[in-house]
């Protein structure tokens, strides 16, 4: 946005109260070629205790320029006072070197130079005037030529990333001043142009040179890359722009000493000149903050027509002062890894995909050799166990590979055999023992047979067959040759689970042959079974009839009937115990003999 002289006239906003400001100071005269010292630039700040105007802003007097300074272009009309005032109270700015008073806002000569470059850059087709600023800056070292011209060209052609220009996450000073003049509060204009900003490049590397007055050394070296100079900031703007973007008011007075806050966690140690890094990631060096809540703290971000593309990023930030560093701007953190936010509040804007320590650690390890992937390792060779072969048996598959004393591989079986026996495992399995009956050249010393189920030895130790050995063992004499048999007599063993035969009892249903002594001695006892009425009943019940083997004078008395229907013992023809035992024993013997 092209800014005119009238746009810089904050006395219009302040009214007549600016003329009555008691703490206004005139800018000292300077030589055209040599910039004033940072101490002399302290006149660019307003006292913290300045009078409050109707709009709630601190009133400061207008600057007085000498003839040489006034003879410059019309854009040389400098903005006096805090170019934006804190809408909620006194500015919270650090007393940086080169700033008079604890609340001073203009920090160094680069701040004034940045103001003067705004309209010139806008009217001169947005060219980079930072090279002139580098020559005028007393702290800017000599910068090498642009190393990455392609990135610089891309960044100079297209819109810059939101941290490329000095305005980091904050509005430009012109926008902050215009917003403060309009409504005493920041107004955000979101836009969709941010998505089109060089998507192929990380925003750390995108054009910090696209802004007209991004940094004082922008033409000489791209600020996104580390400089080769030993005393230059590792990620800084080459000493041109004060860190935090465009030498935020209240920042460190030295432009080169103030490291660019776009890289708040630089892995490099503090620089030799002893300048500490600002605590804030994106709102450092500003007395207000990234949210644009305090206009005076909005870094100058001289965008020259590029205000809208940064406003959307600023609008995405919360307005709760998350990025404000009210209490921590007064200290400088000596640690090279300063946090995003100095205040104890948590940043609501998460780290971007490129804001990882990996990006910076890769740059810091540029000289260190990268770890090279190992070639075929021992683990890989261990996996190729298919190529192994047992040196003893030739096996290629085994649950566990072992080694012998010479380091050769053995299968598990051969290795265990060698370990236990101290010998190599025999390759041919031993044949099963030949049956003793088939042993070659072996014959019985007694009967001269060659077949036997078991070979024995006699008292002299000579082998004998099983038959001769048992005979000698049992009888004490040699087995006679007449007993020799061609075949082997084997015992026909019966099954062990033989159903025991039922004994001769009243419950037995088997017909038992009776002895002759049990004929008619008890015919009177069995008279009840001989009646014509009970015999058919007993026979009809299916009870077996036991016939005696001997003679009987009465045919009816020769039969014993048992009633099986009720299982009761009806009668028996055996009276004496001797006869009972004589009847039971033959039955027991028959059961064992005939079974």
Curated annotation (Swiss-Prot):
Changing residue 585 to L: Found in patients with atrial fibrillation; likely pathogenic; gain of function; no effect on subcellular localization. Changing residue 543 to G: Found in patients with atrial fibrillation; likely pathogenic; gain of function; no effect on subcellular localization. GO terms for molecular function: chromatin binding; DNA-binding transcription factor activity; DNA-binding transcription factor activity, RNA polymerase II-specific; DNA-binding transcription factor binding; NFAT protein binding; protein kinase binding; RNA polymerase II cis-regulatory region sequence-specific DNA binding; sequence-specific double-stranded DNA binding. Changing residue 466 to D: In PACHD; loss of transcriptional activity. Induction: In sebocytes, expression is up-regulated by Cutibacterium acnes. Expressed in heart, gut and gut-derived tissues. Expressed in skin upper pilosebaceous unit. Expression is decreased or lost in acne lesions. Changing residue 466 to H: In CTHM; persistent truncus arteriosus; loss of transcriptional activity. A zinc finger (GATA-type) spans 390-414, 444-468. Residues 236-253, 286-298 have a biased composition (Gly residues). The keyword Transport does not apply. Residues 14-71, 208-255, 286-339, 482-561 are annotated as: Disordered. GO terms for cellular component: chromatin; nuclear membrane; nucleoplasm; nucleus; transcription regulator complex. It comes from the Eukaryota. Residues 500-538 have a biased composition (Polar residues). Its main location: nucleus. One of its GO terms (biological process) is male gonad development. The modification Phosphoserine is found at residue 268. The GATA-type zinc fingers mediate interaction with LMCD1. It is linked to Rare variants in GATA6 may be a cause of susceptibility to atrial fibrillation, a common sustained cardiac rhythm disturbance. Atrial fibrillation is characterized by disorganized atrial electrical activity and ineffective atrial contraction promoting blood stasis in the atria and reduces ventricular filling. It can result in palpitations, syncope, thromboembolic stroke, and congestive heart failure. Conotruncal heart malformations: A group of congenital heart defects involving the outflow tracts. Examples include truncus arteriosus communis, double-outlet right ventricle and transposition of great arteries. Truncus arteriosus communis is characterized by a single outflow tract instead of a separate aorta and pulmonary artery. In transposition of the great arteries, the aorta arises from the right ventricle and the pulmonary artery from the left ventricle. In double outlet of the right ventricle, both the pulmonary artery and aorta arise from the right ventricle. Transcriptional activator. Regulates SEMA3C and PLXNA2. Involved in gene regulation specifically in the gastric epithelium. May regulate genes that protect epithelial cells from bacterial infection. Involved in bone morphogenetic protein (BMP)-mediated cardiac-specific gene expression. Binds to BMP response element (BMPRE) DNA sequences within cardiac activating regions. In human skin, controls several physiological processes contributing to homeostasis of the upper pilosebaceous unit. This is Transcription factor GATA-6. The lineage of its organism: Eukaryota, Metazoa, Chordata, Craniata, Vertebrata. The gene is GATA6.
């Amino acid at each position: 946005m092209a800014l005119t002289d009238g746009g810089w006239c904050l006395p219009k906003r302040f009214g007549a109260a600016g003329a009555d400001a008691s703490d206004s100071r005139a800018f000292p005269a300077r030589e055209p070629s040599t910039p004033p010292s940072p101490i002399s630039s302290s006149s660019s700040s307003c006292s913290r205790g300045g009078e409050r105007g109707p709009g709630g802003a601190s009133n400061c007097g207008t600057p007085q320029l000498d003839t040489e300074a006034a003879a410059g272009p019309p854009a040389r009309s400098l903005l006096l006072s805090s170019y934006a005032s804190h809408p909620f109270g006194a500015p919270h700015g650090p007393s940086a070197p080169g700033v008079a008073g604890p609340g001073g806002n203009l920090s160094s000569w680069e701040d004034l130079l940045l103001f003067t470059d705004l309209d010139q850059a806008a009217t001169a087709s947005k060219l980079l005037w930072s090279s002139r600023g580098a020559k005028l800056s007393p702290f800017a070292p000599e910068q090498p030529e642009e190393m990455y011209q392609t990135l610089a060209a891309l960044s100079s052609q297209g819109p810059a990333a939101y941290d490329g220009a000095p305005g980091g996450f904050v509005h430009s000073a012109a926008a902050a001043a215009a917003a403060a003049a309009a409504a005493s509060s920041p107004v955000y204009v979101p836009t969709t142009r941010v998505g089109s900003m060089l998507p192929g490049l990380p925003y750390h590397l995108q054009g910090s040179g696209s802004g007209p007055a991004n940094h004082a050394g922008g033409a000489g070296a791209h600020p996104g890359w580390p400089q080769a100079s030993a005393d230059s900031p590792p990620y800084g703007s080459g000493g041109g722009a004060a860190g935090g973007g465009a030498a935020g008011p209240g920042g460190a007075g030295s432009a080169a000493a103030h490291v660019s806050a776009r890289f708040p966690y630089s892995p490099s140690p503090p620089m030799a000149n002893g300048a500490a890094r600002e605590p804030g990631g994106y709102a450092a060096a500003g007395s207000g903050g990234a949210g644009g809540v305090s206009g005076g703290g909005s870094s100058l971000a001289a965008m020259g027509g590029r205000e809208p593309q940064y406003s959307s990023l600023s609008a995405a930030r919360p307005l709760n002062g998350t990025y404000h560093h009210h209490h921590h701007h007064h200290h400088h953190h000596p640690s090279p890894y300063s946090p995003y936010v100095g205040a104890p509040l948590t940043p609501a804007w998460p780290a971007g995909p490129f804001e990882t320590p990996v990006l910076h650690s890769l740059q810091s390890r540029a000289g260190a050799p990268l770890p090279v992937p190992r070639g075929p390792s021992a683990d890989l060779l261990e996996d190729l166990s298919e190529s192994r072969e047992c040196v003893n048996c030739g096996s290629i598959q085994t649950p566990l590979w072992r080694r012998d004393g010479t380091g050769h591989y053995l299968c598990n079986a051969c290795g265990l055999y060698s370990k236990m026996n101290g010998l190599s495992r025999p390759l041919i399995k031993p044949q099963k023992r030949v049956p003793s009956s088939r042993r070659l050249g072996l014959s019985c010393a007694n009967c001269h047979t060659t077949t036997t189920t078991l070979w024995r030895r006699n008292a002299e130790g000579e082998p004998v067959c099983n038959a001769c050995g048992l005979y000698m063992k049992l009888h004490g004499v040699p087995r006679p040759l007449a007993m020799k048999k061609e075949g082997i007599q084997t015992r026909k063993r019966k099954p062990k689970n033989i159903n025991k035969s039922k004994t001769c009892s009243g419950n037995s249903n088997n017909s038992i042959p009776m002895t002759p002594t049990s004929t008619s001695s008890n015919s009177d006892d069995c008279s009840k079974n001989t009646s014509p009425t009970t015999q058919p009943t007993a026979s009809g019940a299916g009870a077996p009839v036991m016939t005696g083997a001997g003679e009987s004078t009465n045919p009816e008395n020769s039969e014993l009937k048992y009633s099986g229907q009720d299982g009761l013992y009806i009668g028996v023809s055996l009276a004496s115990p001797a006869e009972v035992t004589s009847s039971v024993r033959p039955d027991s013997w028959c059961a064992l003999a005939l079974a």
